[in-house]
Amino acid sequence: GETHRFRPLIDLYKAAGVKAGHPEGSLQVGLHSLGYVAATSRQAADEFFPGYAEAFTKVGKERGWPPVTRAGFDAQLGDKGALMVGSPDEVAEKILRHSEALGGVSRVTFQMDNAALPQNKLLKSIELIGEKVLPQIH
């Protein structure tokens, strides 16, 4: 979903923490998302989608959800979508945008692995995150 919708919960968490005696600066917020980085946005989406669709269609059957579609997946790749899948520049911009919407985050974690991604592609994604994404967000 849209990250900014979680802001009231984060504000509540921080207010409760301060009320409980914790210094405001000590109350950290993390962002956990499905994520994958490739050289281009199209490559990232095309490589990540098959495993994503397989996993979430299976979960959806158990929960009564409709099957995953490429159109629905692509919609989650947009500016406000929850998926952090794209080129290094796109993912860096999305991390910064989500952090701002949430009032700042201290940690970002990606769940990258899925059944359709071979190890070499995962390792390349990790390399791109370290070399191309992190310098833009620090």
Kindly give the residue locations of the regions a language model identified.
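Active-site-adjacent structural elements that line small-molecule/cofactor binding pockets in enzymes
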Residues: 1-138
